[in-house]
Design a protein with these regions (language model features):
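Active-site-adjacent structural elements that line small-molecule/cofactor binding pockets in enzymes
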Residues: 1-142
Length: 142
């Protein structure tokens, strides 16, 4: 990636025939600190190749669940199904973008500014997530 890539998606580990959504231990191990460590490693390799760190745009993979209700029980249940003890813990994980449209917008912006992630591949967790994302979140980034 450091030698050739223009975009790199840093995603949770997969293994044993399961993705992060179905592998609670892997989901819980992939923390913001682990993500930052992976980005730091990429930056080290870019430095070794004499490429600017900004030459590789970063993307991620996340489960997205949006609700108009703060602390929505459905989102709480999704967080627990992923292995988190509560919604707040899931919201602080790089594998999830969950909450109200304003919360998700703020988290995408925070991750963009603080971590450098510009793109996401998302898995939509609820039927209403797509509509809320298209109507209330996406326009803020266009």
């Amino acid at each position: 990636a450091a030698r050739e890539a223009d975009i790199l998606n840093i995603i949770p580990p997969t293994g044993n025939g399961r993705d992060f959504i179905n592998d609670k231990p892997a989901t819980l191990r992939f923390t913001m600190n682990v993500l930052r460590e992976r980005i730091a490693l990429l930056h080290k390799f870019l430095d070794m190749e004499n490429r600017p760190r900004s030459s590789v745009e970063l993307g991620g993979l996340a489960l997205m669940a949006i609700s108009e209700r703060v602390e929505d029980p459905e989102l709480q249940a999704i967080a627990k199904n992923l292995g988190f003890s509560n919604l707040s813990e899931a919201q602080n994980s790089p594998v999830a973008l969950m909450g109200t449209p304003d919360q998700v917008t703020a988290e995408i912006e925070r991750r963009k500014q603080e971590i450098g992630i510009n793109y996401y591949i998302v898995v939509l967790a609820t039927p209403s997530t797509q509509d809320l994302f298209v109507r209330e979140v996406m326009p803020k980034f266009c």
